[in-house]
């Protein structure tokens, strides 16, 4: 059973603070191993990829190509149930339409003395998309990463995916085709991240790597950062639901379990001002757990990291929500807009009782790649902005240079940078 906390209790702050800092990921010191793998790929290229793919995934690249062929992608698309294809296509259309609204515009202007200033946006040239294998291989995540990159104008999107024995989940390949991703390699782990960052004989390097993975992938992304950009280091999923008494406990229980079934380290939290509702939701969770195919995972998540928090009034939930900074925040209350106006920290907000977080996972149009582990305090979910970069523009004519030069020269001299000062003064006094 999840922990029960009451805001009115004398020891609430102590218990809540401890709850916030509970570690939900198994700590695995893989940095040394990952460093060795990255160095091996940098030095041996394809040979290293073949070695690790054989060792970890049982793939023999003398029997199957490293790159997934166009025929394989087409065959996978044909093999996937038509209803799934149509759902993926609907999701892709909605993601594309929403993310197109995020495209920033160039802003070039002239100030009051005639200096041209502004910024210009350009797409990153090449992006690598890591797609996990196994039970965490989600076609929807392919769309959430690839479609915004396409909208941004990224010319080359490279997908890597672990393939046990060489086989890739057909739905993942179908999603890639729908998103317009054609360059796909059946490699995974730290070795795939290294190949994307540094390149091999077969794989040209990219400029940025996005997508979640296990501890080895996360460590590899950390280690190659600086050589390439990365999106974020994703942790276990989480949801916070703020609910008043006028809710169906079964609805709320289903929402909490939708996160809990992801991972034993996932976290589901309910904050309510009604004790009876809190107890009813707890009971509903226990009933619904018996219906789930992933009940063992969900039960462990709920027991180890779940919480029901009772507050005296709904506005008391606001500071708690901002401290939790949840990946997903549902506002299942009569006036969700009033609460939302005061929420500063959340990866995504789902407004009203009829907006389950799961719609955002799939077909809402918003992105489901969101900051976890309280990182919504300082970061945002994946968007078009992750695939573009801003370049500053500055333009002066002779008159503008004459007006600004004295101050620039003064500051350069004050910092002891004579060449800086001369770079300006030589344009005013060519003989100097």
UniProtKB/Swiss-Prot annotation:
Cofactor binding note from Swiss-Prot or TrEMBL: Binds 1 zinc ion per subunit.
Enzyme category, top tier: oxidoreductase
Domain of life: Bacteria
Record-listed E.C. numbers: 1.1.1.23
Keyword terms of this UniProt record: Amino-acid biosynthesis, Histidine biosynthesis, Metal-binding, NAD, Oxidoreductase, Zinc
Disulfide bonds: none
GO molecular function: histidinol dehydrogenase activity; NAD binding; zinc ion binding
CDD domains: Histidinol_dh
Pathway: Amino-acid biosynthesis; L-histidine biosynthesis; L-histidine from 5-phospho-alpha-D-ribose 1-diphosphate: step 9/9
Positions bound to Zn(2+): 259, 262, 361, 420
The protein's required cofactors: Zn(2+)
Residue positions binding substrate: 237, 259, 262, 328, 361, 415, 420
Role according to the record: Catalyzes the sequential NAD-dependent oxidations of L-histidinol to L-histidinaldehyde and then to L-histidine.
Protein name: Histidinol dehydrogenase
């Amino acid at each position: 059973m999840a922990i029960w906390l009451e805001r009115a209790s004398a020891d609430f702050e102590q218990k809540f603070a401890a709850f916030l800092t509970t570690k939900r990921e198994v700590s695995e010191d893989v940095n040394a191993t990952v460093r060795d793998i990255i160095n091996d790929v940098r030095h041996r290229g394809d040979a290293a990829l073949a070695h690790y793919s054989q060792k970890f995934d049982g793939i023999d690249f003398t029997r199957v190509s490293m790159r997934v062929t166009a025929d394989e992608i087409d065959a996978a698309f044909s093999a996937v149930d038509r209803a799934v294809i149509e759902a993926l296509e609907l999701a892709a259309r909605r993601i594309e339409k929403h993310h197109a609204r995020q495209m920033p515009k160039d802003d070039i202007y002239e100030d009051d003395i005639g200096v041209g200033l502004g910024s210009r946006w350009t797409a990153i040239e090449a992006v690598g998309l890591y797609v996990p294998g196994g039970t965490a291989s989600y076609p929807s995540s392919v769309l959430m990463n690839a479609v915004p990159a396409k909208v941004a104008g990224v010319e080359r999107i490279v997908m890597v995916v672990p393939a046990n024995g060489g086989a890739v989940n057909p739905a993942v390949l179908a999603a890639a085709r729908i998103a317009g991703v054609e360059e796909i390699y059946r490699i995974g782990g730290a070795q795939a991240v290294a190949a994307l960052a540094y390149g091999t004989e077969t794989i040209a390097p990219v400029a940025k790597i996005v997508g979640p993975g296990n501890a080895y992938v996360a460590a590899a992304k950390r280690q190659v950062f600086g050589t390439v950009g990365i999106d974020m280091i994703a942790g276990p999923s989480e949801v916070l639901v703020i609910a008043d008494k006028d809710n169906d406990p079964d609805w709320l229980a289903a929402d909490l379990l939708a996160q809990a079934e992801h991972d034993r380290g996932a976290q589901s939290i309910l904050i309510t001002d009604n004790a009876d509702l809190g107890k009813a939701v707890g009971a509903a969770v226990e009933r619904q757990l018996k219906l789930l195919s992933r009940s063992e995972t969900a039960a462990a998540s709920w027991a180890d990291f779940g919480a029901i928090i009772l507050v005296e009034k709904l506005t008391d939930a606001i500071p708690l929500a901002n401290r939790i900074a949840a990946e997903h925040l549902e506002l299942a209350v009569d006036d969700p807009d009033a609460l939302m106006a005061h929420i500063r920290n959340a990866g995504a907000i789902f407004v009203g009782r009829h907006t389950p977080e799961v719609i955002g996972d799939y077909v809402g149009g918003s992105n489901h790649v969101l900051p976890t582990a309280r990182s919504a305090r300082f970061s945002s979910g994946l968007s078009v902005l992750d695939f573009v970069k801003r370049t500053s523009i500055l333009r002066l004519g002779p008159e503008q240079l004459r007006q600004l030069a004295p101050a620039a020269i003064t500051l350069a001299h004050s910092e002891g940078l004579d060449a800086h000062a001369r770079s300006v003064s030589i344009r005013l006094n060519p003989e100097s």
